[in-house]
Amino acid sequence: MFDSQGEAYKEAFQIFLDHTDQKRNARRWLQQVVDTLPAKRVFIDAGAGNGEVTKAFAGAFARTIAIEPNLYLLKQLQQALPSVEAIALPILTAQPPAQADLVLCSHTFYYIPQDQWLAHLQRLVSWMSPTGVTIVVLQNRETGCMNMLHHFFGHRFDLRRTVEAFQSQQRDRYHVVLTTDPATVDTPDRVKAYAVAEFMLNLLEMKHTPSRRAVEEYLEANFRTQDGRYRIPVHQDFIEIRQGATSRHS
């Protein structure tokens, strides 16, 4: 298991960032939502990490609040964005001082026990202003990455079930839209592909680590292309929640 403060984690994460369009695609998709908001007073980034996503949108809002319980990551965020209001608490105990026009939780639910997902989603929505939107981003359950997790550990991250439970509980109070947006990791060789796979497999706490050979064989069988590259689908689900009734998938 990687330590998020360790060099191995940083190196693997950087290789992932250098070889994927996932973050760029997410910023593009989110920007379209931000552009259509009726007000841009407050932005809450829940699970803000080191502030990379926060930075992309903070300038569009009069006030930005970042929630990040990892003090190492929070320090990086505060250095990069000194004007942001930082809350060093988990989502369930944080109490933001204002309702937000955008509540964003991007790729954070992996690190939350799944039996707490519904409570976290409810908490995020409670911070939303009457005309605002809550957005949760997570990898789609059918991506190449999730297939790999399932192959080695029998597990997938599936946000849709939590959304269905939320809708069942809230009935017609909220308008919910689920959109899947394509993204890919594209590496030039097996060494970098393995580093990315190792990073992705560490989304789960591993009791029994698969061997390097087993992971490399899986990469060869599932992600190697004819030109010798490795392409791993990492499509993202975007859940939009607003006040209102009806829901749809796209």
Q: What are the roles of these predicted feature ranges?
A:
Residues 104:
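A conserved beta-strand element that flanks and buttresses the S-adenosyl-L-methionine
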Residues 156-171:
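Short alpha-helix
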Residues 112-123:
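A short, conserved alpha-helix within the catalytic core of class I
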Residues 175-248:
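Conserved Class I S-adenosyl-L-methionine
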Residues 1-38, 40-49, 133-158:
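Conserved class I S-adenosyl-L-methionine
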